Amino acid sequence: MNSELSAPASVNTCRLLSLDGGGAKGFHTLGVLKEIEAMCGCPLYQTFDLIFGTSTGAIIAALLALGSSVDDIHTLYKEHVPVVMRQRTASGKSRALAHLAKTVFGNRKFADLKTGVGMQQAV
């Protein structure tokens, strides 16, 4: 038996990046993504066919799929996460996040995405 595996003539692949949630833990995710982006040598939306995220990971996924660099997202997080996390109530955090979403995403549409994106809200 030949131990060398040969790839089929036509290979259907889907390169998936999955990002977890966890509020301010998004900074850890961004640190890992910075290394992946450096290893790939190109924006992550060019590397992955689908970027999927939960909670803060969904925010990062959407921004990556729109073409933002990891550095740009990290800057955004440094500026805005403390404001959101300072809110003492869930409704206060929700209001702060809604305001941030309007500021960051504005009138962007799904047609603006440069790669596939999936999002899941944590319950």
What does each of the following model-derived ranges do?
Residues G116-V123:
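Active-site gating loop/helix substructures
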Residues G106-G116:
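A short alpha-helix-loop-beta-strand transition element characteristic
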Residues S10-S18, A24-R108:
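Patatin-like phospholipase
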Residues M1-A9:
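Flexible, membrane-associating and regulatory peripheral segments of lipid-active enzymes
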Residues L19-D20, Q120:
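Short hydrophobic segments within beta-strands
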